[in-house]
Amino acid sequence: FAGENSTATATATGTSNVSSLASAPNPNQAWADVLVGELFRDGVRVFCVAPGSRSTPLALAAERHPSARVVVCVDERSLAFYALGVGKGAGAGAAGAAVITSSGTAVANLLPAAVEAAESAAPLLLLTADRPPELRGTGANQTIDQTKIFGSFARYYADLPPPGDGAPARVWATAANAATRVLRGARPGPAHLNCQFRDPLGPAPVAWDPARDLRGLEGWEARTTPFSFTHRDDGEPRSASRDASGARALAR
């Protein structure tokens, strides 16, 4: 393994990312921060990163999170089994670890661990980066059909739309909530979130509309509870049913 960050410690509190979502230089960074932040609040404290270009927003979001533990390895297959071991060792009801990979053959390398996770009922979250719809099926570098690549072994799957494409960032938040419910459920196993990203993949500035794209996430950074447990004006907890329905629609 290439290394592990020494400053981030996996704590029991769901600390928000330190950067303001609205001040992110581009929607990729904001969406990735929401996804990693939600996963952490839902119990995913370890993020195993295999370096790659398309997954840059996810890797940087994991590194930015002040309390997440980040493990780095250049071999996706080994990294996935490491994450599987974290999940098996965490005990019943734990969300386990996430694996972050780039697109293409990097994703295919996760299949052995996904099969093992399914057969042993162990939590394993697979966060894979992908090209946006217009680059699929075009012969673009490191592009394969990643939709439902793990077949029936995945207990949950969602193909998440590109940031800034019209769907609000809370769609990614509810997908994170849905995936971790499976990971922590009575019959855990692999959950797969396929994350589409357009350029720029790094922190380069690009015009976007925070007021439109972050609607429904007002106050998110100040909270430590998962997005699904938002509150009505009367203070009673509720499930974000409309967004959960949207996540289910993506998980087809």
Give the location of each predicted region.
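Short coil/turn connectors at secondary-structure junctions
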Residues: D42-R45, H65-R69, A90-A97, E119-L124, ...
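Short beta-strand segments
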Residues: I100-S102, P123-D130, G151, P161, ...
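Conserved thiamine diphosphate
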Residues: Q142-G189
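Conformationally flexible catalytic loops at phosphate/diphosphate-handling active centers
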Residues: A22, N26, A175, R181-A251
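Active-site-proximal loop->helix
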Residues: A61-E63, G85, A113-A114, D130-S152
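Short gly/pro/ser/thr-enriched loop/turn and capping motifs at secondary-structure boundaries
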Residues: T56, R77-A80, A106-A108, R131-R136, ...
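Thiamine diphosphate
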Residues: F1-N5, N17-S103, A247, R252
